[in-house]
Every structure is written in structure tokens, then in C-alpha cells.
Curated annotation (Swiss-Prot):
<feature type="modified residue" description="N6-succinyllysine">
    <location>
        <position position="8"/>
    </location>
</feature>
<dbReference type="InterPro" id="IPR002338">
    <property type="entry name" value="Hemoglobin_a-typ"/>
</dbReference>
<feature type="modified residue" description="Phosphoserine">
    <location>
        <position position="50"/>
    </location>
</feature>
<dbReference type="InterPro" id="IPR012292">
    <property type="entry name" value="Globin/Proto"/>
</dbReference>
<dbReference type="GO" id="GO:0043177">
    <property type="term" value="F:organic acid binding"/>
</dbReference>
<dbReference type="GO" id="GO:0042744">
    <property type="term" value="P:hydrogen peroxide catabolic process"/>
</dbReference>
<feature type="modified residue" description="Phosphotyrosine">
    <location>
        <position position="25"/>
    </location>
</feature>
<feature type="modified residue" description="Phosphoserine">
    <location>
        <position position="36"/>
    </location>
</feature>
<feature type="domain" description="Globin">
    <location>
        <begin position="2"/>
        <end position="142"/>
    </location>
</feature>
<feature type="modified residue" description="N6-succinyllysine; alternate">
    <location>
        <position position="17"/>
    </location>
</feature>
<feature type="modified residue" description="N6-succinyllysine">
    <location>
        <position position="12"/>
    </location>
</feature>
<keyword id="KW-0561">Oxygen transport</keyword>
<feature type="modified residue" description="Phosphothreonine">
    <location>
        <position position="138"/>
    </location>
</feature>
<keyword id="KW-0349">Heme</keyword>
<dbReference type="InterPro" id="IPR009050">
    <property type="entry name" value="Globin-like_sf"/>
</dbReference>
<keyword id="KW-0479">Metal-binding</keyword>
<feature type="modified residue" description="Phosphoserine">
    <location>
        <position position="103"/>
    </location>
</feature>
């Protein structure tokens, strides 16, 4: 999926507004994913999966940090996320559908926290971005 110049502007602008809250939003989105799609919990049998747990927050921060890296490398997502793609494909063996579920929950979380900024254009740009990230993360499954 190709991100247009307008998409890139929307993504970077939104990520700048998120600022220091990215880790919190990542944890909240992960909580939302576990609550809405319980099958996603199977990858975290060693975690305390109760809402707001320290382990979920810490992993949510890892997700947010990876997305921050992706935002900084919009023109080379495969290069920026190659190691993460290897990890999820070869070691963790995460079912690719879970990236789509988490992406949806990330969109919902961002919309809840930034309703004014979450215009249809921003929504579409972020959806394309999360789809592009998901595509990269699942590219080594083949």
C-alpha cells in the first residue's frame, strides 16, 4: 500500500500530537484488543492480562515504540521493521489476523483520545498506515 504525501503528513502530525502518550495508548489498545477479541490472549499465557496490568502496559509501550519507529521511516517500512517481522513470523508465530485486530483497536483508542483531530482523512491515513505496518509484519510468513 502506497502512502500519499497527504497520508504521510496526517500520520506524522497525528503522531506528534500523541507525543508522550503513545505508550499509554498502546497499552490501552492492547487492553481493548484482549477484551474485544479474547483469542488474542493465547500469545500471552505468561502475562497478567487484567485491564491496566503492568505487563500489558509494558507490551503496549513496545507496540507504540515500534509504531514510532515506523512513523520515522514511512518511506522504508520493510527496512525499519525487518527485525520485528522476523520475530513475529519465525519465533512468536503470531496469526496475521491479530495485527488487523490490534490495528482496529489502535484506531478506536486514538479516536477516543483525539476526537477533534480524528477527521475522516486522518482516519483513512492511519488505517492505511496500520495496514502497511501489518503487511510488513506478515510479509515473512510466506
Amino acid at each position: 500500500m502506497v502512502l500519499s504525501p497527504a497520508d504521510k503528513t496526517n500520520i506524522k502530525s497525528t503522531w506528534d500530537k500523541i507525543g508522550g502518550h503513545a505508550g499509554d495508548y498502546g497499552g490501552e489498545a492492547l487492553d481493548r484488543t484482549f477484551q474485544s477479541f479474547p483469542t488474542t490472549k493465547t500469545y500471552f499465557p505468561h502475562f497478567d492480562l487484567s485491564p491496566g496490568s503492568a505487563q500489558v502496559k509494558a507490551h503496549g509501550k513496545k507496540v507504540a515504540d515500534a509504531l514510532t519507529t515506523a512513523v520515522a521511516h514511512l518511506d522504508d517500512l520493510p527496512g525499519a521493521l525487518s527485525a520485528l517481522s522476523d520475530l513475529h513470523a519465525y519465533k512468536l508465530r503470531v496469526d496475521p489476523v491479530n495485527f488487523k485486530l490490534l490495528s482496529h483497536c489502535l484506531l478506536v483508542t486514538l479516536a477516543c483520545h483525539h476526537p477533534t483531530e480524528f477527521t475522516p482523512a486522518v482516519h483513512a491515513s492511519l488505517d492505511k498506515f496500520f495496514t502497511a505496518v501489518s503487511t510488513v509484519l506478515t510479509s515473512k510468513y510466506r
